Amino acid sequence: MPEFPEPEERNALAEDCRRCPALAGSRTRIAWGNGPRDADLVVVGEAPAAGNPDADRWRGGNHTGMAYTSRHSGRQVRRLVADLPDEAYYTNAVKCFPADPGDPTDNREPTAEERANCRPYLAAEIRDVAPEAVLATGKHATQSVLAAADRSLAGGFLDAVLDPVACPELGTTLVPVLHPSYEAVWRARLGYEDRADYVAAVRAALPSGGRRDSGDEDSG
């Protein structure tokens, strides 16, 4: 099981941000980025889910205040990174839970304005950490990272999976990966025999091929 982040790793850039009134009203806490500020990777998701306040410590960023701390997606993505293996800083393109007006326990897609309001935070995190690569989990996270680099997604998302994109505007390389909710379905359709095959392909797509896997066993 992946390690749960320590509270002091939480990188609150604006503790009570209210740029988006709807999100300020729907969130419980802002799910800020967390992890080493000199990490090899920055992992970017779309936005935190509602989470489960009654779960163990993996309650989700809406309750922990830290990105990628949900029981399903959070642990699954952290397990992927642990298997690469590299240290990672985890964040979301939109930091607050975007509640669906019809069902406040479910997510809606963040609006273009909400993405734009949060984009300076995302760009600041990436530039501050200065990772060798950014792993964007899913289409919307990929689009948000590209927008922060003044770029856009060319073609379909599945064609972009594990196809590195140099982002000199952010000083890093973007590597789109499958969203954890759909990984098991789509990795087979994309030709990966099993999870180990997919993890090896993710590692190979990184600029270093996986920092510790390429001769840096004793680092960190």
Residue ranges and their predicted role:
Residues 2-220:
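A polyanion-binding, active-site-adjacent surface
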